[in-house]
């Protein structure tokens, strides 16, 4: 799945000291978030779970792009933040966040395990129901670069 590109003048990710800082990822399909609104109001929990998995897929795709461009591989997920647009009565935000956590653990094994924050908000960009952002570490691939072995 190709990750959604930023709609405005910001970077999808930035690397500093082998850490990838990833911009917030929405569940865009063909450039658009298809189902908009708040979880349990306009969006079912099942649809929110589907969208959170898409967010995680986009995030992982950007991490792969960042790693490849820097001749590295993804080392580990350092932290994950999950945002859920919902009303104050909805108490299932952690269950939704579990879907993103499970995705990264499935992809990276123990290196996909991470600390996590989950936040309920009244509205997200483009009226999306869910969004994630994260930080991940990159590791140089083993090899000989400029006469040095890594």
Locate the predicted segments by residue.
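Short glycine-rich or small-residue beta-strand-to-loop segments that form or flank ligand, phosphate
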Residues: 79-85
